[in-house]
Structures are given as structure tokens and as C-alpha cells.
Curated annotation (Swiss-Prot):
PANTHER family noted in UniProt: AQUAPORIN OR AQUAGLYCEROPORIN RELATED, AQUAPORIN-9
Motif (NPA 1): 64-66
Membrane-topology descriptor: Multi-pass membrane protein
Species of provenance: Laccaria bicolor
Induction: Expression does not significantly increase during development of the basidiocarp.
The gene coding this protein: AQP5
Subcellular location field: Membrane
One Gene Ontology CC term in the entry: plasma membrane
Lineage of source species: Eukaryota, Fungi, Dikarya, Basidiomycota, Agaricomycotina
Protein name: Aquaporin-5
Length: 254
């Protein structure tokens, strides 16, 4: 339940900020534009911080399947709990998107003229810029998630100045501002399969149809799902190989 609420908050703040910024560019929605790409970065950063604050006391505070799988691989998180965590995370993404969509339903209708297209689907799920190749999309998500997991491991490393639960959300806030400002433009920096798949599933049911899944040869599975999972695995390998001094790592040869 904590992972569900954490991801729901993440999407409410992140997708909500995206809706306000993009939809307000239409004069029929708002008399003036309300924000910029930085506003969207802040929305996702506030979402990850509040999601972590709410969930850390009751769960591990992963609110990201890539983090959950990474922690199971490198820090002994029980594999038997992974499916339940991921289910809660994806459901949280679905519900968070549904709530934001309900809040901005009329604005979306005005912006789209009654139709449902990628222009507003991208407010909830990630879609790469047209010039990006398949390999470039994969690498962008892989790199961003590797960085995310390296920092996440460091923040929880007792041998490397681990933060208390109270400070962890603030550190994640700074991290997400940085990820958005440096690696967010080209693919929308999903770095979290639940934050993309949950809202994408909702979009398919809310009138956007199968186009959200058919986009760029099933982009939805290999860029915002597979790439983050593998990116977290690579980040964990690098951290445990070169930095980690604990005895609970599967990398024993150091």
C-alpha cells in the first residue's frame, strides 16, 4: 500500500505539473502560460520527495520497479516481495494518472479539440523526440537510471555517509532536479517503469487507444521498462565494484 501511495503521489505532482505547463499554452485554457520545462522538473522532483516521505516508513520507499529489482539483486531485498511491490507501484501510477486526468479533463478537451492524441498523452507517459533513434532512446533511459540507482545506493550506504529517512527525500528531490535538467529532454526521463506503464495503461482505457502501445514499435516496453531495469543493474554493478565496502553485495571478488 505504501508503494502504491508513493507512486500515486509521484505521478500526481509530475503529470500534474506537465498538464499545467503544456495545457496553459492554449489561450482557451489559460490567459497566460503557467511555467516551463523547469516547472515540470520541479513537479517530478517534488513527487519523488513526497512519495518517498510517505512510503519510507511503511515500505522500503523504492516507488520504482527498477529500484526494487536492483535492491533485490544487490542488497538482499527478498525476491518473493518483488512482484507485490511492482504491482502496487504500477497500480499507483495508474491511479495517479487517472486523478490528474480527471482534474484536467476539460482543459485537455479544449487543448485537443475533443480528440485524444500523443500531444496530451505525453503529459502522462513518455514519448521520445522524433530525431531519436531506437538505440538512442534506450541509452538515454539506461544512463539516467544507472545514475539514479548509483546515487540511491550511496544515499543508503552506511559505509558512505547514509542519510536518515528524514533527509533521503530531500536528496532525491535534488537528484531528480538534476536528472531532469541534464538528461530529461530527449525521452522525458521515465527512469521508472511504473511511472510510465501505469499511466500508459490508463491512457489506453481513457480513449487514447492502442496507439500508446504501438508507438515506435512497442517503445513502451524497451525504453521506459527494460532500459531502466537494466540501467539500475548496471549502476549497481558499478557502485559495488568500485565504491561499496559492505559485506552484503553479491560481488565478492574485490
Amino acid at each position: 500500500m505504501a508503494e502504491f501511495v508513493g507512486v500515486a503521489l509521484l505521478v500526481i505532482f509530475g503529470a500534474g505539473a506537465a498538464c499545467q505547463v503544456i495545457l496553459s499554452t492554449n489561450p482557451g485554457v489559460s490567459p497566460s502560460e503557467r511555467g516551463s520545462f523547469l516547472s515540470i522538473n520541479f513537479g517530478w522532483a517534488i513527487g519523488i520527495a513526497t512519495g518517498a516521505w510517505v512510503s519510507t516508513g511503511m515500505s522500503e520507499g523504492h516507488i520504482n520497479p527498477a529500484i526494487t529489482i536492483g535492491m533485490a539483486t544487490y542488497r538482499g531485498f527478498p525476491w518473493r516481495e518483488v512482484p507485490g511491490y511492482i504491482f502496487g507501484q504500477v497500480l499507483g501510477g495508474f491511479v495517479g494518472a487517472a486523478l490528474v486526468y480527471a482534474n484536467y479533463f476539460h482543459a485537455i478537451d479544449i487543448f485537443e479539440g475533443g480528440h485524444r492524441t500523443q500531444a496530451t498523452a505525453s503529459l502522462f507517459a513518455t514519448f521520445a523526440l522524433p530525431y531519436m533513434t531506437q538505440a538512442s532512446c534506450f541509452f538515454s533511459e539506461f544512463l539516467a537510471t544507472a545514475v539514479l540507482f548509483i546515487v540511491f545506493l550511496a544515499l543508503n550506504d552506511k559505509h558512505n555517509g547514509a542519510l536518515t529517512n528524514g533527509l533521503l527525500p530531500f536528496a532525491l528531490f535534488i537528484l531528480f532536479i538534476g536528472l531532469g535538467a541534464s538528461l530529461g529532454m530527449q525521452t522525458g526521463y521515465a527512469v521508472n517503469p511504473a511511472r510510465d506503464f501505469g499511466p500508459r495503461l490508463f491512457l489506453a482505457m481513457a480513449g487514447y487507444g492502442k496507439a500508446v502501445f504501438n508507438y515506435r514499435r512497442q517503445y513502451w516496453i524497451w525504453a521506459p521498462i527494460i532500459a531502466p531495469i537494466l540501467g539500475a543493474q548496471a549502476g549497481g554493478l558499478l557502485y559495488d565494484t568500485f565504491i561499496y565496502n559492505g559485506d552484503d553485495s553479491p560481488i565478492k571478488w574485490r
